[in-house]
Amino acid sequence: QVSNSISLGFCYLTLRQSPRLSKAQAQRIISIIHRSSLLETLPLDEDLITPSHEVLPGWSIPQGPENHEVPLPPQLTLLYHLPVELHTMAEQLKLRLATLGCELTLIFHDAKNWDGCRYLAQADMMMGDRLIGEAPEYTLEQWLRCDTLWPHLLTGAQYAHLQATLDAVQAQPEARSRNDALRN
């Protein structure tokens, strides 16, 4: 007997700030995803991918300014991995960005994580998902600490700062203190 169920998790899109993609352009792309009907147009089973304004339950996603005047780069590359539902999201994003003059090249990494992915250093954007499980804060901390994505996305100084911050969070004696520190 095979069981079908949907687990709580989150889909993420990370953007590498570089000469090809400025902070303002990255904010515009995030705005296109969160403030447009892009997520509602996904031809997926109901509730498989649903829009959210939270990273984890109770943790709001910071919203930058919506600026339609910021021109997008002429070309970008999106690297993404399983689950297969992200194929649909990637294709919809490609179509939406094309209407705005940005050609999005899609690269699919056929795995459930970034281990062994040789394109991480080249992509402008990376998309994947994480299951949350029983301990959302622990999941987030482990994702930030252990995922092979971060050393490719952050500078050495940024990555060292991230690790030092996570170490300081883990030094908190109580779970509530650790969770509060992780939020900040």
Q: What is the predicted role of each segment?
A:
Residues 1, 14, 113-146:
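Pocket-flanking alpha-helical
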Residues 1-68, 150-163, 184:
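Local pocket/hinge segments that shape ligand/substrate recognition
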Residues 18, 28-36, 41, 96-100, ...:
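Structured segments of extracytoplasmic/periplasmic soluble domains
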Residues 39-42, 46, 106-114, 141-184:
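Extracytoplasmic/peripheral linker and loop segments enriched in polar/acidic and small residues
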Residues 52, 95, 140-144:
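Short clusters of hydrophobic/aromatic residues that line enzyme substrate/ligand-binding pockets
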